[in-house]
Amino acid sequence: MGAAEVGVLKVIEEVGLPIDYIAGTSIGSIIGGLYSVGYRSAQLDTLFRTQEWLSLLTDREDSLKNSIFEEKDGTYYVFGFPISSSKKKTNEPGKFGALKGDRITDYLHRWLVNSPSGYFRSSSTGASGSALHVSDSTDFSRLPIPFRCVAFDAKKMKEVVFTHGSISTCMRASMAIPGAFKPVRMGEQMLYDGGCINNLPVDVVRAMGADIVIAIDLNQTQHENRDISLEEMFGITGILDWLVSRPDWKRYNANREAADLLINPPLEGYDVLSFSKAKVAEMLKIGESTGRKFRSQLLEIKKRVME
């Protein structure tokens, strides 16, 4: 569904509206993080169209996709999808998730290192006489566009807003869907998809200093305000139910209202498993066509910004 966000960004760029701050959750953290280091809609469009997203997000072993059941290097696969491993790693979390997410982490690292801005460089020195590596602890406020991403600490049941750290790891934590991906551990924190707690972080980007906020909301269902007790949230079933039903509708609805412009592409019939190239192309087109419907509002915001 994130491809639709790229389509909207294309229109924002076309009208020449500058972006000074970015905050994202889940797939929005990946798009936002890449955008913050120099990727633009054209490169993101290509990336969405050319990646094998099913393999990328599921750690699928493509060489085994035609095998019903296969073992390779200590891991068992069904049609190429990893289902269990005989290898035990003491530093690997073992709760609420089937997929480690190693492949997406590796690709995020690669995309960041090769960012158009050249912000991250693997060499020992750069043009300025200093260099950063993508795995270093990075101050997100010093990126070409200041950036924040949101994750959910399942131990404390609270929001975590990343302001610094390994950007690829933080992006990976923000998209760790409960029940699908292993959580990311940082110290005592067990981190999952930020959509569990704040799926439209308008308040986060406001706190960064943004005066005018454009929110791209991929959610397709509007709900009444609903609070969920801690008892409901304990365990994997509770977390999954919490993710599906949205944790704090008062906050979500408040963030919708707080946005200066809310763009909500119509994505009924699409979901997080819409990985095919045809579906991706359709969502890119939907995002762009939706963005064009808001062209006059975007131009008005540009006028306000430039005054």
What positions do the PLM features span?
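Patatin-like phospholipase
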Residues: 1-25, 33-307
